[in-house]
């Protein structure tokens, strides 16, 4: 059983989603957004840090997955997004959580099957995968999709290790994955 916290970073709205993975089963635990007022950037970053820390305290996740920064048309927006993302990562690292990063395109590909899926498609598929009666709000759905992507990555990686031809190879692959996952050094890009 693994609890995964997914974060969709933003300087004004940061989405979060928490799921529990037990074998092949994914269970929804909670989601929402951290909204910051139109304060100055340092105050917004402080609110993001406090919000992520509070979520970690409430749900006690084992792993932290976050969307990578994409290149925005506006460099100032990209810098603010990077700062919000860094703030969320610091909150996770301060609680000794391993951090995993995923490209937005990979998240959409994993959850929807199309790397260029729109927000509505992500919301629909997240609700379907987690058997939710209502669609989560867009930023929370993105965060849940990031957590689902990480759960899928773990399951696939362990399947690869289990399908190795020899016990020695299985042990080496399993040890490698445990090391990578415990240190949070796993990055996937598409």
From Swiss-Prot:
Keywords: Cytoplasm, DNA damage, DNA recombination, DNA repair, DNA-binding, Endonuclease, Hydrolase, Magnesium, Metal-binding, Nuclease. The keyword Ribosomal protein does not apply. InterPro entries: RNaseH-like_sf, RNaseH_sf, X-over_junc_endoDNase_Mg_BS, X-over_junc_endoDNase_RuvC. One of its GO terms (biological process) is DNA repair. Its main location: cytoplasm. It is found in: Cytoplasm. Binds 2 Mg(2+) ion per subunit. It comes from Actinobacillus succinogenes (strain ATCC 55618 / DSM 22257 / CCUG 43843 / 130Z). It holds the Pfam family RuvC. The active site is at 8, 67, 139. Mg(2+) 1 binds at residues 8, 139. Its EC number is 3.1.21.10. The gene is ruvC. This is Crossover junction endodeoxyribonuclease RuvC. CDD domains: RuvC (cd16962). Its cofactor is Mg(2+). It catalyses: Endonucleolytic cleavage at a junction such as a reciprocal single-stranded crossover between two homologous DNA duplexes (Holliday junction). GO terms for cellular component: cytoplasm; Holliday junction resolvase complex. Homodimer which binds Holliday junction (HJ) DNA. The HJ becomes 2-fold symmetrical on binding to RuvC with unstacked arms; it has a different conformation from HJ DNA in complex with RuvA. In the full resolvosome a probable DNA-RuvA(4)-RuvB(12)-RuvC(2) complex forms which resolves the HJ. Belongs to the RuvC family.
